[in-house]
Design a protein with these regions (language model features):
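Surface loop/turn motifs at the tips and blade-to-blade linkers of beta-strand repeat domains
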Residues: 136-137, 145, 214-218, 258, ...
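Conserved beta-strand position repeated across blades of beta-propeller domains
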Residues: 131, 147, 155, 227, ...
Length: 535
């Protein structure tokens, strides 16, 4: 896959060389091809759903049913009422630190959450550097935790609401975003020289952060975490339960949300998941860590990212959360790349499994082969000399930081995903292509000139590293301004993000989508509260 034509979704579409990969995504390169009329409900750059709705069956005419008595109607209404299990014992603490949220990147599908109209002369799309999102104000909204998916995002507020925004093609937002926006002639708009149009034509119901209805959750439910994949969202509760909505995709299109449900448009409780302490989302798979230190996985397993072999004729079994072959009771942290997974154990070991065709697992065996996968969790020996505290993965690269603040990277290098200039790479640790150009950094390497790193985050082909004193570095692919550096040129090495919006602010987290990114900073004098549904 050429470096300038990467996927449009975070941890989503694999390279052309990825075996059994998910549906190929659009190139990020701009095109001059004519575009048809498009309904305003859907962004021109959204993923096209591959699965068309089945025609409705013809029904024989039947006699009208007799009207129900008042007693029968009341009974039917009671029966239709959602039943939830009782709230269990608290095992998780809800976050309380209120955050300022800064966004940047493309935003043409509403994933920046800036709405659909120009505000104070600024467009809600093509944001080159970090911009404070007033729709997520620390005063009036109060975000305490946030997650970015491929083309959507989700956030948890201090008063226990879940907000979603971005692409809602397969129910990823968990709410109705129908919009009577009418038809737009996109070709005419692109040819227009008028840059002063206040309304971008983006669906305001998708591009404006909006709460998911509480009616889908058990009364008294308190949330502690949300995670977003490419086409789904999941929420973890204080008592270790998990709600989810959306769908998982495979190379054939929509795989399903459960064995019986193709697309879940609104939140539903996943009944088999209990005592969960943390979640992590890949492109189309989820990991969950329980209170005993065990890990379960579900979703699409075509690249063995679930840690178990999936037989094609029984592929829907991958949608059932099942355990992974890790040492029992020892896992303390989980993380996902697009098609690969990681686990950190209490003894300081790092385990990896899933896709490894660009050495993204940090395992040299079969790295560089088109169909390279690691079926079962394998210990990453190259990381044994470091006490890894945080880890993340993109489509074909990964990064981590140690307890000493070191930044380590590995995997695909042709788009500067690993933050090294080519002449600084150690030849013995690199696989070269047929043109003798660096292709894969097989062995995790410490990136020079950055220190005190406390957390890391990866987009498709770009990355972030946050320091203990609240600064943030970015590097990699930047065609849609997703590095926050104000340029569409690749950023070769970790570079400090510095503009008036975040200068002097303490950044404590970075979150990378496909063509957009999010920074979370400590809000000035923000309240620390987290309410309860129905309170």
């Amino acid at each position: 896959m050429p470096p300038k034509a990467r996927t449009a979704v975070s941890k989503a579409a694999p390279s052309e060389k990825t075996a059994a990969a998910a549906k190929p995504a659009k190139s990020q390169a701009k095109t001059t091809a004519a575009k048809p009329l498009t309904n305003g409900n859907t962004s021109s750059r959204k993923r096209k759903a591959e699965d068309e709705a089945s025609p409705q069956p013809e029904l024989d005419a039947v006699a009208p049913l007799p009207k129900k008595t008042k007693t029968e109607a009341a009974a039917a209404k009671t029966k239709a009422k959602k039943l939830f299990p009782e709230i269990g014992k608290k095992i998780n603490d809800a976050p309380t630190q209120v955050l300022d949220i800064y966004v940047f990147g493309e935003g043409t599908s509403g994933e920046l959450g800036l709405g659909s109209k120009r505000v104070n002369g600024k467009k809600p799309i093509d944001v080159k550097r970090p911009r404070l999102n007033d729709n997520l104000s620390s005063d009036s909204v109060g975000i305490v935790q946030i997650s970015s998916g491929g083309m959507h995002a989700a956030a948890l507020t201090r008063d226990n609401r879940i907000l979603t925004w971005g692409v809602n093609d397969q129910g990823a937002l968990g709410r109705d975003t129908t919009w009577e926006g009418g038809l737009r002639d996109l070709e005419k708009e692109e040819d227009s020289d008028d840059e002063d149009e206040d309304d971008t034509g983006i669906n305001p119901n998708e591009s404006t952060p909006t709460a998911v209805s509480n009616e889908h959750f058990a009364p008294g439910t308190k949330f502690v975490q949300v995670v977003a994949s490419d086409s789904a969202t999941f929420a973890l509760t204080e008592d270790g339960r998990v709600y989810g909505w959306g769908t998982f995709r495979s190379s054939d299109g929509i795989l399903g949300f459960t064995e019986k449900i193709k697309v879940q448009q609104t939140p539903m409780l996943l009944p088999t998941l209990k005592n969960i302490k943390g979640l992590s989302a890949g492109s189309n798979h989820i990991l969950a860590l329980d209170h005993k230190g065990n890990v379960v996985a579900w979703g699409c397993g075509q690249q063995n990212q679930l840690g178990r072999r999936i037989i094609e004729r029984n592929k829907l079994s991958s949608l059932i959360p099942q355990g992974i072959g890790l040492p029992r009771g020892k896992t303390v942290k989980i993380a996902c790349g697009a098609y690969h997974s990681f686990a950190l154990d209490k003894n300081g070991h790092v385990w990896g499994w899933g896709l490894n065709n660009f050495g993204e697992l940090g395992l040299q065996s079969n790295a560089g082969e088109d169909d390279a996968v690691v079926l079962k969790p394998a210990k990453i020996s190259y990381l044994e000399d470091y006490n890894i505290t945080d880890i993340d993965g993109g489509v074909h690269h990964s990064l981590a930081c140690s307890d000493k603040g070191e930044l380590l990277t590995w995997g695909r290098v042709d788009g500067y995903q690993v933050g090294f200039e080519f002449d600084k790479l150690t030849k013995d640790d690199v696989i070269y292509d047929e043109r003798d150009s660096p292709r894969i950094l097989v062995k995790p390497a410490v990136v020079p000139d950055v220190a005190n790193i406390t957390s890391v985050a990866s987009g498709s082909d770009n990355s972030f590293a946050v320091t203990g004193d609240g600064k943030v570095y970015s590097w990699g692919f930047s065609a849609n301004y997703q590095t926050g550096q104000g340029t569409i040129d690749d950023i070769k090495t970790p570079t400090l993000i510095d503009n008036s919006a975040i200068r002097g602010k303490k950044i404590i987290g970075a979150h990378a989508g496909g063509q957009f990114s999010i920074l979370a900073g400590v809000a000035d004098a923000a309240a620390k509260v987290n309410g309860v549904n129905g309170a």
